[in-house]
UniProtKB/Swiss-Prot annotation:
Residues 1-14 are annotated as: Coil 1B. Residues 136-1818 are annotated as: Tail. Residues 1-135 form the IF rod domain. Disulfide bonds: none annotated. The keyword Coiled coil applies. Residues 1490-1505, 1570-1579, 1616-1636 have a biased composition (Acidic residues). Residues 382-398, 986-997, 1686-1697 have a biased composition (Polar residues). One of its GO terms (cellular component) is intermediate filament. This is Nestin. It comes from Mesocricetus auratus (Golden hamster).
């Protein structure tokens, strides 16, 4: 009985114990439930806040977009008005020209009439005298008749010497008549002249009694006929041509000569009747140059009569006529020279000299010289003639060309002043006056970049030719005068001396005329600029100082830019100086300059005028440039400049540095806008400059990177140019249309001015100077322009050398000819005169020869220097490559370790799969239960976060608006000029920078080893990454199955162990703790990243143009994304969607964290007391918040950053292009992974959605929204926002999932379209991918990239500093967030791969021009995608299998989803948000997807169960690497793996690319074939990766598990996430160890761990990431259910959640199907290059991509610049918001962290990339 009693007691005790235990468990469960409910409420509140904030941001974006469009319209209107004014002026000019021509013709006719009258009078006098003599001596009647005949004969024969005498006298008379006839003729009615001419011609026949007048005209006609008959036809034809072309000149010369002749004839006639006919005959021959034409036109009878008469005296008359013609030509040249001395401009002199020389040559019979001169002068001469005509017309209008030029310059000056004022007043006003003024200037600039270089070379040629012509004319005039002296014209030697003096003066003037022209051009420019051009040197110095100040003051005032823009006008000299400097820079700058100076010196000697001002200016300019170059040497760009310095050493470096300073400072300033605006112009220049610079850079930087870049550049350039042209056509259609109109107007002006082109040339030079100044302001543009100009100058120098040689040749033959006639000259004085002239010519020739030799030597020296530079660049590139390879080696090692970790984690996960699945099932139910309240909480929380973000974003948007306004103000100027220049310069700078990156690469490679690594390395890395991808994909497939099983088991076990409430509470706590840690991590990473990013930002300042250009499309994409964001907001509004997003997000976040943190973070988060999971929750929240933020804030942020980033896109687009190129290269490195995977598709999707331009705007919009959201969050809501953001994100996740689902469909479609576009952009994307891969090599590069991205855009310097400060201010929460993001990045690597592919797709699809930026954007979007992967979506990407299923499902849908994918670009942000929301829990996610994701999360939880204690909140477990916390944890885990992560990012991105590689490739198919190829290459590399079964690598294809960081980059998106989870777990420990480093290490060598973590996480995630496909499927289903467009982003979001669930379901399948699915994504990638890519990853990643792309297009692109900074701020400022945003940004942050690789990528998207990153971080 006692035993029974005791047994009963024991039973009771046991029951009591059980009851107590159950009660305690119940209490714990209730506590968890209460926490989960609270978290859900908070999430709801934050979601509501985020939604409200997003709405506000959307409104702001819309307002900003409207404002921007209004400005564009104003600019277009102003441009149209300006064009109309220009057309009116041109018409007026033409009318004046015709009037002048008529007046000249009338003057000629009057002169003929006077001659005929004088001849008639003389004839009558002779008759009267003969009659008188006969009457007086009637017996001498016969003698009288003979006497009468004798005068006639005398008139015929003696007329010849007297004609010659008149010819000699003409110089005396003509100097004054030449200028005087014009005013006189102008005063004289044309009709009177015509009548008089007709009357004269009419009377000539009636002068039967006066045979002399007919003879007189006969000699003229006879001369014409004789010339036609006896004279070489070439002479006559040449004369005819000259008469036709230079006819005004002839008319002027003839009129002046005729006037002088008539004056003499009248005087002589009054004195000597015999001399009148002779004089008349002489003047008739002088007139004959026209006269053959005029009289031939006027009457053939006279001509026939003249010819009959002439036939009598044919021989003598012909000789006389020939001599007279030569003399006349020489005299005319001398007269023209004297006239020039009298006030005619050197241009006129040159112009007149050209035709005079031609005529003289013709008269001399110097046909060869004529042909040469005609050829040389036909261009310059015709233009000179045209300019002389215009000058004559101007003179005829009593306005000297100088006056006209001054007027034009004054108008231009006034316009510049007005432009400055308008710039000061505002961009809208600026756009109008700029549109009016600058369009012409822009057109002139457009023409000036091309035309100006041509004009410079042409001017140089013209000057040389003018000098030649002056020398030749002098020589010819001397020869002619000698001939005349030999054929005693009866003209005193004094006249000959005078003529020779005039010729010498003329030669000096002509020699100095180039200089004078330049100076005169500068003078009008000075007049216009209100500043003397000689002070142009001072101005150059001032300009350099101003540029430095402006660069230092970030181009504080638009006026300075305008002044600098005016200075560019002044820099016509400066351009000449630049030409010299560039010649020297190309020819060691100094030697060409010295040669030019030497050339100028002999010219000075010849000209008797010192060219020293120009030389001094050049020297000063070069000195300033050298100083600036030396000053800016410190910066990486300075290194680039140093590399370029040999080419551009002084000016280019100085300009680049100043421009860098300005660009860096003004990148955030309107300069970006201006650059964008100006980029159309600049792009033309930049394209020219890029072509030159590419040539130079390719020559100088023949390194593999340069070769790759050059190889890619042709493609990129073509694509970029095409894209830029398309973007310019789109974004700059307004600009380019005004610019084209301006160019057309400018061309018309050139046509008008073409005749006085010199004013236009001066304007062109001025415009070039403005452009150069603006280009200097946009260092890259200046650098490129400088290089281009240097090349042009070199060419011009060569041409000038050639021209000098030709001149020497011409002068030498002329000298020889002249010497022969001079020798023949009997007059010693004439010989003396000729000798000095010969000496002068010989001296000039000798000096020219010496100069030529010196120039040749300098060119040789330059070539040697270039070869040395090339060698150094190649060596530096090789060292970079070595470093990259070394970086890749640790990455591969890390990847291998990560793969091993992933395998271990897989085993552990498999062990925990059952328990995790059970826990996951329990957790699913709990989470479902929790997600409902959580969805409301998330909504509240997301709303709060959104509201906070909105408030902060509003603050930042206001800042952004202010910055945008400032930028807008500065931009209008730079929009018109720097834009094209900046674009071209940015291209050239991109090229140069890319080339210089070789040199800088060594230094930058430390920070951006992948980035700096040459495209070859990038390609190599891409291949290795592809191998790694395949390995990672294989590993990820296995890991995905294991992970899915583990996650499901972990989830089930966690669900069981952790009651729903506890799991929910713990999820929230984990999210919060993970968010906090992630925020800390992201803070650390952000700090670390920001520091290198700041460096890179400074470096990327040159790329700001490209970023700005990219931002333009980003702005467009933002606009599109605005709609997407609206859809996202709408989707976010749905609690269910938020809950869905939140469930998968929470699950994924837990899974992600669990998986990601399992090895490291299980310990780390357990060690961190689930702070990691709290952080992960925060990450999830942040992901949700970011989902909401990406969607809502993306919209609002798009509005805000749309402006900022629109500005950044505008100003930074060119640089961003450069950055895009470099970053494309870098992004191709690391971006091969993420850029391929996600970057582009996102952007492409958005572009597909709204079109290429719209996509960039949408991207920009989202980027801005996300960026604005990110920044405000970063600033205002450091940690409070974090929970709010978490809640908001949770809510946003709930809403966003639907949004994302819808948006993802739309985004997928967009992604398809974009990917198609991206396919075109593949080359650049591939480069970007490689760059992305390389950036993934080193976190330094990531940080540098981030810093570069932060600093990269114009606002990069400032915002980078702010971000840096914020980042530093932000507790390591941001670093943690970044690190967590890094963890996410490990997972997001997938997202990145997807996003990069999306970005690449969006980049290339979004805009071909922004392609580079898309590369960055790819990186950014890749980061978003990668960060988005931290959400379930990322986990899905991390789950190769689900991705594969999804990829299969998606890939069929991929094509449609591709289209949606492009829409998903918009939706990708939504998907990203969905991920984040899914991390928060996508309550709205279909239960199937939720179940699938939950199962996936359970499997991940199982893995986490192994690594994390059951007590670890499922939030940790379920926080998949995709979860913000997972990402944070993962990022933190990956932080040791941060390098692995970085690389892992790259590899993870490749993994994502591998997973998304099908999508990525398809994206790349859209994005670029390179993208898919790179994915395939990455897959191949992945297959080659050690530790990964080739089969796995094949399956992973482009998602190599992560043994190789590159593989991670390449294929390891899913694998990257799987690895990232594994390595994130290992790396979690390492990350806790390396924590801060890991951010860099992720980027650096950490990828392997990150890859392992990511691969493991990816495999786990691929279990969940498999969802990605299912996401895409479910997402597509949801998207299909929801409006693809409106819900496109939502589609992505819900699709992501659905994908998460699907990933879970697929993860189960994916385990089995993982290889198949991975293969399938690849297959689908092949099958659906666009869709498959997007959907391969888009299956998981396209959603991520789409989401990230969407968020990243929205956030990624726009945030690329603004958001990168803003998001970075957000990461820093609002750890929780960051973490929420980190959930989004984690996907995006993966991209920001990936952005670290993106650093390496240093996209021109630096700003946009940062924004994308920030959005990614958000």
């Amino acid at each position: 009985w006692r035993e029974k009693l005791e047994a009963e007691v024991q039973r009771q005790n046991l029951y009591q114990e059980r009851v107590a235990h159950m009660e305690s468990s119940l209490g714990q469960a209730r506590e968890r439930l209460g926490r989960a409910v609270r978290g859900a409420r908070e999430g709801r509140l934050e979601l509501q806040q985020l939604q409200a904030e997003r709405d506000g941001l959307q409104e702001r974006r819309e307002a900003l977009e409207q404002r921007l469009e209004g400005r564009w319209q104003d600019r277009l209107q102003a441009t149209e008005k300006f064009q109309l004014a220009v057309e009116a002026l041109e018409q007026e000019k033409q009318g004046l020209q015709s009037q002048i021509a008529q007046i000249l013709e009338g003057g000629q006719q009057l002169a003929h009439l006077k001659m005929s009258l004088s001849l008639e009078v003389a004839t009558y006098r002779t008759l009267l005298e003969a009659e008188n003599s006969r009457l007086q001596t009637p017996g001498r009647s016969s003698q009288a008749s003979l006497g009468f005949q004798d005068p006639k004969l005398k008139l015929r024969f003696l007329g010849t010497p007297e004609n010659q005498h008149l010819g000699s006298v003409l110089p005396v008379l003509s100097p004054t008549p030449l200028p005087s006839p014009l005013p006189d003729t102008l005063e004289t009615p044309v009709t009177a002249f015509l009548k008089t001419q007709e009357f004269l011609q009419a009377r000539i026949p009636t002068l039967a009694s006066t045979p002399i007048p007919p003879m007189t005209e006969a000699p003229c006609l006879a001369k014409a006929e004789v010339r036609a008959q006896d004279a070489p036809l070439s002479l006559l034809q040449t004369q005819g041509e000259r008469q036709q072309a230079p006819e005004p000149l002839w008319a002027k010369a003839t009129a002046s000569v005729s006037t002088g002749v008539l004056t003499e004839l009248e005087e002589a006639g009054g004195q000597q009747p015999g001399h009148f006919p002779e004089d008349a005959t002489a003047s008739a021959p002088s007139l004959s140059p026209h006269h053959p034409v005029l009289e031939a036109k006027d009457g053939d009878s006279t001509e026939s009569r003249g010819s009959s008469i002439f036939q009598e005296d044919e021989g003598q008359i012909w000789e006389l006529v020939e001599k007279e013609a030569a003399i006349e030509l020489k005299v005319e040249s001398s007269l023209a020279q004297e006239t020039q001395e009298d006030g005619l401009h050197t241009e006129e002199i040159q112009d007149s000299q050209g035709p005079l020389q031609k005529e003289t040559l013709e008269a001399l019979g110097e046909e060869p010289l004529m042909s040469l001169k005609i050829q040389n002068h036909e261009t310059p001469g015709k233009e000179n003639c045209n300019s002389l005509r215009s000058v004559d017309e101007n003179q005829g209008t009593l306005k000297s060309p100088e006056e006209e030029k001054q007027t034009l310059l004054k108008s231009l000056e006034e316009k510049d002043v007005e432009v400055e004022k308008t710039l000061e007043k505002g961009v809208p006003e600026l756009s109008k006056p700029l549109g009016k003024e600058d369009p012409r200037i822009e057109d002139q600039e457009l023409m000036s970049p091309e035309g100006t270089l041509e004009t410079l070379s042409f001017i140089g040629k013209r000057n040389e030719e003018v000098v030649r012509s002056s020398e030749e004319e002098n020589i010819e005039s001397l020869a002619a005068f000698k001939k005349e002296s030999q054929h005693p014209l009866g003209c005193p030697e004094e006249e000959i001396q005078r003529v020779e003096r005039l010729i010498e003066k003329e030669g000096q003037e002509s020699l100095s005329s180039p200089e004078e022209e330049d100076q005169e051009t500068d003078r009008p420019l000075e007049k216009e600029n209100g500043e003397p051009l000689k002070p142009v040197e001072e101005e150059d110095q001032l300009f350099e100082t101003l540029i430095e100040k402006e660069g230092q003051e970030s181009l504080s005032s638009p006026e300075e830019e305008d002044q600098e823009t005016d200075r560019p006008l002044e820099k016509e000299e400066d351009q000449l100086v630049e030409r010299l400097v560039e010649k020297e820079g190309q020819e060691s700058l100094s030697s060409p300059e010295e040669e030019d100076q030497e050339t100028d010196r002999p010219l000075e000697k010849e000209n008797g005028e010192p060219l020293k001002p120009v030389e001094e200016e050049d020297q000063l300019f070069e000195t300033l440039i050298e100083k600036e170059g030396q000053e800016s040497l410190s910066s990486p760009e300075e290194e680039d400049q140093e590399t370029d310095r040999p080419l551009e050493k002084e000016e280019d470096q100085l300009v680049e540095r100043l421009v860098e300073k300005e660009g860096q400072e003004s990148l955030s300033s309107p300069e970006e806008e201006d650059q964008e605006t100006d980029r159309p112009l600049e792009k033309e220049e930049d394209q020219l400059v890029e072509t030159l610079i590419e040539k130079q850079g390719q020559e100088c930087l023949s390194s593999p990177e340069e070769e790759d870049q050059e190889t890619d550049r042709p493609l990129e350039k073509e694509e970029d140019q095409r894209v830029e042209r398309l973007i310019e056509k789109e974004g700059q259609e307004s600009l380019s249309s005004p610019e084209e109109e301006d160019q057309e107007t400018y061309r018309l002006l050139e046509k008008e001015n073409g005749e006085p082109l010199k004013p236009v040339e001066e304007e062109d030079q001025r415009v070039e100077r403005l452009i150069e100044k603006e280009d200097q302001e946009s260092l890259s543009s200046l650098k490129e322009e400088d290089q281009r100009i240097v090349k042009t100058l070199e060419r011009e120098n060569w041409e000038s050398l050639r021209s000098l040689d030709e001149n020497l040749d011409t002068v030498m033959p002329l000298e020889s000819k002249n010497q022969k006639p001079l020798k023949s000259l009997e007059a010693e004085e004439e010989q003396r005169i000729v000798k000095p002239l010969e000496k002068v010519s010989q001296d000039s020739i000798g000096s020219l020869e010496k100069e030529n030799v010196e120039l040749l030597r300098s060119l040789e020296d330059d070539q040697i220097t270039e070869s040395l530079l090339k060698k150094g660049t190649q060596e530096s590139l090789e060292s970079h490559e070595d470093r990259n390879q070394e970086t890749q080696d640790p990455q591969r090692f890390l990847e291998e370790e990560g793969q091993g970790i992933v395998k271990q984690l897989e085993k552990e996960n498999q062990g925990f799969l059952g328990s995790l699945e059970e826990e996951k099932v329990v957790k699913r139910s709990l989470e479902r239960e929790n997600h409902e309240p959580l969805s409301s909480v998330e909504k509240d929380w997301v709303t709060e976060s959104l509201l906070e973000r909105e408030s902060q974003d509003s603050g930042k948007s206001l800042e952004g608006q202010e910055a945008f306004r400032c930028l807008g103000k500065e931009d209008p100027e730079s929009l018109q000029f720097p834009e094209v220049q900046d674009q071209e310069i940015q291209r050239s700078l991109q090229q140069e920078t890319q080339q210089t990156l070789g040199a800088l690469g060594d230094e930058q490679m430390a920070s951006e080893p992948p980035e700096k690594v040459g495209p070859e390395l990038l390609k190599f890395l891409g291949n290795g990454q592809e191998i790694v991808r395949s390995l990672e994909e294989q590993n990820q497939e296995s890991l995905v199955s294991v992970k899915e099983t583990s996650v499901e088991t972990a989830k089930s076990s966690d669900m069981e162990d952790i009651e729903p409430l506890k799991s929910a509470d713990e999820d929230l706590e984990i999210i919060n703790s993970a968010g906090a840690q992630e925020s800390l991590w992201s803070m650390e990473v952000t700090r670390e990243t920001t520091r290198p990013l700041e460096k890179e930002v400074q470096e990327s300042l040159g790329f700001v143009g490209g970023n700005q250009e990219i931002l333009r499309p980003l702005e467009r994409g933002n606009e599109e994304l605005g709609s997407l964001g609206k859809w996202n907001l709408e989707a976010v509004d749905s609690p269910e969607a938020v809950e869905e997003g939140r469930q998968p997000l929470g699950e994924e976040a837990c899974l992600e964290m669990g998986e990601h943190q399992e090895p490291p973070r299980s310990l780390g988060e357990v060690e961190q007391g689930l702070p990691g999971s709290g952080n992960q929750q925060k990450w999830e929240d942040r992901a949700v918040e970011n989902a909401a933020a990406d969607q809502g804030p993306t919209l609002g942020r798009t509005g805000i950053e749309s402006e900022d980033e629109a500005e950044l896109p505008l100003s930074g687009q060119g640089e961003k292009e450069e950055d895009a190129e470099e970053r494309e290269l870098q992004l191709d490195a690391m971006g091969e992974a993420w850029s391929l995977a996600s970057s582009e598709p996102q952007e492409p999707r958005v572009p597909s959605e709204g079109g290429s331009a719209g996509a960039p705007q949408g991207l920009e919009g989202q980027s801005e929204q996300v960026g604005v959201l990110g920044v405000p969050v970063g600033q205002g809501m450091p940690e409070v926002t974090e929970p709010l953001l978490q809640e908001d994100v949770a809510q946003a996740g709930k809403r966003d999932p639907i949004e994302l689902t819808l948006g993802s469909d739309a985004a997928t479609r967009a992604g398809l379209g974009l990917e198609q576009e991206v396919a075109g952009s593949g080359g650049s994307r591939h480069l970007a991918r490689e760059e992305a891969i390389h950036p993934s090599l080193g976190e330094e590069s990531v940080e540098a990239k981030i810093a570069h991205d932060l600093e990269g855009p114009g606002k990069e310097p400032k915002e980078a500093g702010a971000l840096e400060s914020e980042i530093s201010e932000l507790p390591r929460t941001s670093s943690d967030v970044l690190e967590s993001k890094g963890c996410k990045q490990s997972e997001p690597v997938l997202g990145w791969a997807v996003e990069e592919a999306s970005v690449e797709a969006s980049d290339h699809e979004g805009s071909d021009a922004p392609e580079p930026r898309p590369s960055e954007t790819e990186g950014d979007e890749g980061a978003q995608a990668a960060l988005a992967p931290p959400g379930p979506k990322l986990m899905e990407p991390c789950s190769p299998t689900p991705i594969l299923k999804d990829a299969y499902e998606w890939q069929p849908q991929a094509e449609g989803t591709r289209e949606t994918g492009r829409q998903l670009e918009g939706g990708s942000a939504s998907l990203e948000r969905v991920e984040d929301e899914q991390e928060f829990g996508l309550g709205g996610i279909p239960e199937g997807l939720q179940d699938w994701e939950e199962s996936r999360e359970e499997s991940e939880a199982d893995e986490l169960g192994e690594t994390l204690p059951d007590s670890t909140p499922l939030g940790l477990y379920l926080r998949s690497p995709t979860s913000p916390k997972w990402d944070q944890a993962g990022e933190q885990r990956l932080s040791p793996q941060g390098e692995a992560r970085k690389e892992g990012w790259g590899p993870a991105v490749p993994a994502a690319q591998g997973l998304s590689n099908p999508p990525g490739e398809e994206e790349r198919g859209h994005d670029s074939d390179l993208s898919s190829e790179e994915f395939e290459d990455l897959g191949t590399e992945a297959s080659l990766l050690p530790g990964l079964p080739k089969e796995v690598a094949d399956h992973l294809g482009q998602v190599p598990p992560g043994p190789e960081p590159e593989c991670w980059d390449q294929g390891g998106e899913s694998d990257g996430f799987a690895d990232e989870e594994e390595s994130g777990e290992e790396g979690e420990e390492e990350e806790h160890e390396d924590g801060t480093e890991s951010g860099a290490q992720w980027w650096g060598s950490g990828p392997s761990k990150v890859q392992h973590v990511t691969q493991r996480g990816d495999l786990q995630e691929h279990e969940s990431v498999g969802i990605s496909g299912p996401w895409d499927d479910g997402w597509r289903g949801a998207a299909a259910g929801i409006s693809v467009t409106g819900l496109e982003t939502e589609s992505q979001d819900s699709a992501e959640p659905s994908g998460s669930e699907v990933s879970e379901s697929v993860s189960s399948e994916g385990e089995d199907q993982a290889p198949d699915h991975l293969d399938t994504p690849q297959g689908v990638t092949n099958v659906v290059p666009g869709a498959g890519d997007t959907f391969g990853i888009s299956g998981q990643a396209p959603n991520l991509e789409s989401e990230h792309m969407n968020g990243r297009l929205e956030n990624g692109l726009e945030q690329s610049e603004g958001q990168g900074v803003l998001d970075r701020h957000q990461d820093q400022g609002h750890p929780s918001q960051q973490q929420e945003v980190g959930a989004l940004k984690a996907p995006l942050l993966g991209s920001p962290v990936h952005r670290g690789p993106s650093q390496s990528l240093e996209f021109p998207l630096s700003g946009a990339d940062r924004d994308s990153w920030s959005s990614g971080e958000d």
